Amino acid sequence: MKHECREGVRGLRFSRRYFLKQGGIAMVGLSAMPAFLQRAVAATPMPNKKQLVVLFQRGAADGLNIVVPFGEPSYYRMRPSIAIPEPRRGGGDAAVDLDGFFGIHPSLAPLEPLFQKNQLAIVHAAGSPDPTRSHFDAQDFMESGTPGVKSTEDGWLNRAIETTPEENASPFRAVAMGPNLPRMLRGAAPAIALPDVRQFKVMAQSPIVEGGFEAMYAQTVDRALRGTGTETFEAIDMLRKADPGKYQPENGAQYPNGPLGRNLQQVGQLIKADIGVEVLFVDCGGWDNHVNEGGVQGQLSNLLRDLGQTLAAFHQDMGDRMENLVVVTMSEFGRTAHENGNRGTDHGHANCMFVMGGPVKGGHVYGKWPGLESHQLNEGRDLALTTDFRSVLGEILENHIGVKELKAVFPGFDNNPRKFPGLIRA
């Protein structure tokens, strides 16, 4: 891969060239590099560092209209006004056929080439086994990784980082794009929230330090960043000098001009900066469509258009870097199989997950399809669950990131590799 550097010093040279090209920074020799990057040069090189981006669709996305089971007759009986039409030639107002049974919403058409190139996989009828229909509880369970257990204090992604310690870890190893650190990244391992790369504000886990990272460091009260404050200042200064406002996506990629597009573009900036980023979190809200959800057009369509264009732009922008990168989407639960009286859908159960990247065995819809006949539905109203979300995440963590202690990441869950969906190349 052209962008990957097999030796630490060459990796830093790439960073200098990148910043010179993209943001106008001028650095000469190792003396200009932050201390944590200097130590990374002296340490044993880690070629082909793997990275993971988690995108949370907050609000409970409608998986049945995102990945449409057009081969299921019951689908059209249940959704007379919001169902997505079956695929047909020459029309942009129908599901985009994936395999003769499933199709994606037409607003996700930019993702179809990635599916055909085996860079995108889908897991249907996936999610949390907990029966709650509460957004708050379901999100908490999905982020803690312990469905049904409210006493868990840390998040599964933080535990994953904690089980794979690095001697010379970057203060930017775990980053959330946004003003608050999500439940998923809270815990003992250092993690930061970055509202905007252009503003250079870093938020910590404690509300005491909401004034920004400088105030937090002065107070030294946050355990997640204690001992790494100076290095984080250096990393922030490095980004500031890089002038991220001048960033230009590569390969002709064009991100949508919205919160999700801006966040994924900044995720790309952080990855390309070679400052040790390993896991990143992005929130994407607005999926709770009880009223006037719409079908081919409408509220859901608008959200999916933004999502599809953003993910496609990110994939294009990353180029060869996608060989070491996986993006996974998740939502707290799905929606009811039947549309409601307001041409929307209500809180349901199972959903779909997207997994994108070079390590992905794409071009396939994974998971056992439970069916939509009345006797096949969960509680007579929802898509039934056949794949636990922890199996999907567990496979990504073990086969991509290299986490070996999945019992510590998902306590109480039997994450036997033989039960993995099989969507990541080991």
Describe the predicted segments one by one:
Residues 2-320, 338, 352-359, 364-426:
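Feature for exported/extracytoplasmic and membrane-associated proteins, marking the mature portion
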Residues 323:
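Active-site-proximal segment of RNA-dependent polymerases
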Residues 326-334:
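Acidic/histidine-rich, metal-coordinating catalytic segments
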Residues 340-343:
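Histidine/acidic-residue-rich catalytic or RNA/ligand-binding cores of hydrolases
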Residues 347-348:
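Conserved active-site-proximal phosphate/metal-binding subdomains
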